[in-house]
Amino acid sequence: MSNILKFGIPKGSLEDATVDLFKQAGWQVGISSRSYFPTIDDEEMNCKLIRPQEMGKYVERGTIDVGIAGRDWVRENDSDVIEVCEMVYSKVSRRPVRWVLVVSQDSPVQKPEDLHGATISTELVGFTKRYFAERNIPVTVEFSWGATEAKVVDGLCDAIVEVTETGSTIRANNLRIVCDLMESVPVLIVNKAAWADPWKQAKIQQIATLLKSALAAEGMVGLKMNAPNSAVDAITEILPSLNNPTVSHLYNSDWVSIESILPEKEVRSIVPKLLKMGAEGIVEYPLNKII
């Protein structure tokens, strides 16, 4: 096979969620605990496990053609890559993560300017330095190897810049968020030379379309039913849909078939209403993709 796309799968917190996303999109990815080279049932692709913190530099160099990494790490490394699309998912939820400025609960700091001359600990050193430099706030930024929250509690620094999804760990450590510095989501990033290759660009666009369609189907289901003609207006009035419900006349009958796509959590409340309106044969089915 002459055409091979080198794809970087993020190792760590996004790893399992990424494998699940590929599965829903139509690819089977297998990861061994002893290998950094996942298998994939697509002979046009080779996969490598790479830390999101390093994904940008490897894509920029062309070591891999395309990969998934948080926008935060792409910005941290100032990587010169093409961002194809956002893919909002994480280890906990389907929402962005936030990099926040955090101090101890009893700190007098209320805004970034109050940290003049302070020491800040974070994994996101480059971004944090640029953030304060752009605002002409002199600070010392130190790299944290982990357990960052404990450092501000123990007085090893004046503040930290830390990532959070829910804020629960920050609150549990008796810390307080001063402000949000950046919101980040996973992004599909591509090497510029790879994007200029027609075959690779087409393959990347195929992958992007199917991954995004799998994300769009999260929490959505299909619902179909039969109903008398006389109930169509009332049913379609209450039935959620992507655009409008599909209504098809049944052969040699004064009944119709109605089909719609809606959030799964709404089914439990809408089915009793549909039954009262005369709907029958209601079927709910799962969705893998919405394109």
UniProtKB/Swiss-Prot annotation:
Its cofactor is Mg(2+). It is an enzyme of class 2 (transferase). Disulfide bonds: none annotated. One of its GO terms (cellular component) is cytoplasm. GO terms for biological process: L-histidine biosynthetic process. Feedback inhibited by histidine. Pathway: Amino-acid biosynthesis; L-histidine biosynthesis; L-histidine from 5-phospho-alpha-D-ribose 1-diphosphate: step 1/9. It holds the Pfam family HisG_C. Keywords: Amino-acid biosynthesis, ATP-binding, Cytoplasm, Glycosyltransferase, Histidine biosynthesis, Magnesium, Metal-binding, Nucleotide-binding, Transferase. Its EC number is 2.4.2.17. It catalyses: 1-(5-phospho-beta-D-ribosyl)-ATP + diphosphate = 5-phospho-alpha-D-ribose 1-diphosphate + ATP. GO terms for molecular function: ATP binding; ATP phosphoribosyltransferase activity; magnesium ion binding. CDD domains: PBP2_HisGL3. InterPro entries: ATP-PRT_HisG_long, ATP_PRibTrfase_cat, ATP_PRibTrfase_HisG, HisG_C, N-reg_PII-like_a/b, N-reg_PII/ATP_PRibTrfase_C. It comes from the Bacteria. It is found in: Cytoplasm. PANTHER family: ATP PHOSPHORIBOSYLTRANSFERASE (PTHR21403:SF10), ATP PHOSPHORIBOSYLTRANSFERASE ATP-PRTASE (PTHR21403). Catalyzes the condensation of ATP and 5-phosphoribose 1-diphosphate to form N'-(5'-phosphoribosyl)-ATP (PR-ATP). Has a crucial role in the pathway because the rate of histidine biosynthesis seems to be controlled primarily by regulation of HisG enzymatic activity. Belongs to the ATP phosphoribosyltransferase family. Long subfamily. This is ATP phosphoribosyltransferase. It comes from Geotalea uraniireducens (strain Rf4).
